[in-house]
Amino acid sequence: MTTRKEFLMQTTLATTGLLLQAYTRPLTAAPVRSGYQLKIMATDWGFPGTLDEYCAKAKAAGYDGIEIWWSLEPARQNAIFDAVAKHGLDIGFLCAGSQSNAAEHLATFKEMVDGAAHNTRQKPLYINCHSGRDYFSYEENKAFIDHTRAVSQATGIRILHETHRSRMLFAAPVARHFMDTIPDLRLTFDVSHWCNVSESLLADQPATLALALERVDHIHARIGHQEGPQVNDPRAPEWSAAVDAHFAWWDAVIRRKRAVGEVMTILTEFGPPDYMPTLPYTREPLADQWAINVYMLETLRKRYA
């Protein structure tokens, strides 16, 4: 006789299986022009081991490359390049500043972007920027974009600005102003932040979303919701509305990239605690971060390759 616990577990697994099936089917009605490629990147966020262990695990899981913070320390730079070369991985870099003073912040940002872009070891697929701050003025934040446009034109590297809380593009209507005034602004699309900031799945901002989706060159594939930047497990049926919304946005980006024949990069970016919800007192994570990111890797590969 099946116990109630067993029944609930069987029901949950069956429902989850249906959700997985829906998103592992290839994207339809999306003609592919020559030149389209999908590159899926691994995050080192929350990884407990060494650089070599991280790169080895990413390669074994099927990732094409890694996304990692650019370091201003030469020894760390060499360690990163040695590890990706050893394991045959592509690379994308993260760059940012941290100071509360806009001029000092911009100086650090420029040093990081310039170092990542002009390194002589391995050309990055892209540079993703946590640009400016939400409390800097428009002109102060625009200086970050102006610098990256110049570096991108000089090097041919895609330099992108992430839709991220606390940064210049922290909310959809704020980002809309930048997009309206800077026609060649290119984005890393982490829409989970906008969902959290607006406390919605953005159904009331279709025009802004449509404009943003045309600017996306890189996706951070984490699923947020109305009350937070990360669901505890995207395979859980209670998150179906958020999952549906995020895949609809990502589908639109991929259709455009396929149509024009461009490389598309995606980072699977479910994070560790405190992004990952935990149990009280023990702080035990509610799900396995690495397993969720590999699930996202496999799902995205089947859908968008």
Predicted regions: what they are:
Residues P31-R33, C55-A60, P74-F93, K110-K123, ...:
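Acidic (Asp/Glu)-rich catalytic clusters
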Residues T12-L13, L20, N101-R186:
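Active-site acidic/histidine proton-transfer and metal-coordination neighborhood
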Residues M41-G46, W69-S71, A96-S100, G132-D134, ...:
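Active-site beta-loop-alpha junctions enriched in small/polar residues
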Residues Y36-T43, I66-I68, I91-A96, L125-C129, ...:
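Hydrophobic faces of well-ordered beta-strands that scaffold small-molecule active sites
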Residues G97-E111, Y135-S137, F144, Q230-S240, ...:
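Surface-exposed, active-site-proximal loop segments in enzymatic domains
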Residues T12, L19-A22, P31-R33, D52, ...:
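Histidine-acidic metal/acid-base catalytic patches
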Residues L51-D52, Q77-N78, L106, N141-K142, ...:
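Conserved strand-to-helix beginnings and helix N-cap segments that scaffold or border functional pockets
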Residues T2-D114, W290, V294-A305:
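N-terminal pre-domain/capping segments
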